[in-house]
Amino acid sequence: MLVYVRGAGDIATGVAARLVRAGVSVVMADIAVPTCIRRTISFCEAIRLGEVEVEGIRARLAQTPAEALQITQTGDVAVVVDPQAKMLDELKPAAVVDAILAKRNLGTTRDMAPAVIAVGPGFTAPVDCDAVVETMRGHFLGRVITQGSPQPNTGVPGIIAGYGRERVIHSPAAGVFWSDRAIGDIVSAGDVIGYAGDTPMCTQIDGCLRGLLANGVQVTEGFKCADVDPRGDASYINYISDKATSVGGGVLEALAMLTDVFRG
């Protein structure tokens, strides 16, 4: 079975990892210049680097649908630049998963594939998808919804070790992002972690820099550029998060509900 995942950031990567480990072939699509910050555990880095490995699963960049299918036949994840999902006609996946996490629907419709699964707010099942998976941290994280919508976006990041909004760093100005920091660095409150042009941006808390935008990305004021983990454990940068794993499990459950992937 082939599944086409829209988005290839950290949550989408958690989805893809669970699918691949369950024996499902995966093609992931993202924009030409991805803007994810948790790059050490995001398959979209294959667009920038050519290939990347996360938790033992390799993802490789493909230029065409045919090349993408060849890559999936090796057991690897294929990553394509296809923000408008134009490759669907050639790929003919059994299911489409929208894991862009844009907090709104960027064009996913129920007729894209026999099964269409969405992730996070901005979708209503069964209106624009067959099922949608909850992404808000808390009691309902990872649950499959077949009638209705997930909880609305609050604009406040999930709480980790007592910190929510403080752990995410947004650009104070428009400009080209650059940093001499690296994901995994231990930082202290007040440290400069990067710049938008000549304007510095600082962390508000102590912790481990677990997310950092790639250098050279054009940002607007308020753009999410970095994420500090207050737990301070640098090893976490190498592992898919608890949230992404839970959401991935929900997508896998929805896929089993909507298709015959696990039926003899």
Indicate residue ranges for each PLM-predicted region.
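Well-ordered secondary-structure scaffolds
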Residues: 1-264
